[in-house]
Amino acid sequence: MNNVIALHNIHANVRASFNFEEKTPQIDRTAYIHPLAAVIGNVHLGKRVMVAPAASVRGDEGQPIWVSDDVNIQDCVVLHALETHANGELVREAVVEVDGEFYGVYISERVSLAHQSQVHGPAFVGADTFVGMQALVFRATVGKNCVIEPKALVMGVNVPDNRYVPAGALITTQEAADNLPTISEAYPLKGLNKAVVHVNTELALGYRKQNNVIHLAA
């Protein structure tokens, strides 16, 4: 893992009453961050992560923000979280717990965050899930192999594995989340996330290589 501090769009957070430490993003060498994206503070980006133009991954208030391997963060996506510490103490209701560790936002492996979507912590998104264009996940957990269709809102609930949220739906009660439809073989978007992950991991590696070539030629 590398501490990347040379680029103006990738830098440490500032100290504040809710965040006593300056932390620099931890970024795998195979991840790619577009120069017009911002990655700030206590953030982990795993292998082959793609961060597209105008995306913001900001671990300066709620933190840490963890992005696992093979995740794509598309154009204008926002990852941010509510204050996770107050006077040096953990705000328990403002974090999600994964394997005994606490996070403002946790994005699992092979998740797609499509254009203009937002995941605002405390929030967890399970592996192989697709979060559609302009969708919002806030104070919620989303299981694995799910699809959040465009412009849907998921707030204050736990979405079970293998469910989809219809486009434009407002899911704000646990009853509504529990009654979401299961993804079947006939569901039109069943294979979408796998295809999107395939494209974006290849783009991350390609742009990373191109970026290295440009620096060598400079």
Question: For the regions a protein language model found, what residue spans apply to each?
Answer:
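Glycine-rich hexapeptide-repeat left-handed beta-helix
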Residues: 2-22, 26, 60-69, 74-105, ...
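A positional/architectural concept
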Residues: 27, 31-59, 65, 72-73, ...
